[in-house]
Amino acid sequence: MIFKGDSVRLQCHFKTFSGVSINPDNVELVIYDKAKNIIETIPITDENKTATGQYYYDYVVPDDIDEYFIFEYRGIHNTKPILAREKVNIKFN
């Protein structure tokens, strides 16, 4: 469980359908609230890459988010969208 106001490392690993790690173009991290409204869009660079296809971002959970948020890593591979999405539960205490 993650606390409001705390930092959380959001990670993803992009792979092809055959399981090969890939580096998509134009990688972004999108944060959604529980109503699926976009809170923030963050460009992801090579500084956020740990290995082929593996990315992270240290995100500070805003105090005004209730219950959970959803994060989505997205990019373009071979002219097609590729994405990974996950829900993060949060609490105040």
Please place each PLM-identified region on the residue numbering.
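Contiguous segments within soluble domain cores/interaction surfaces
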Residues: M1-N93
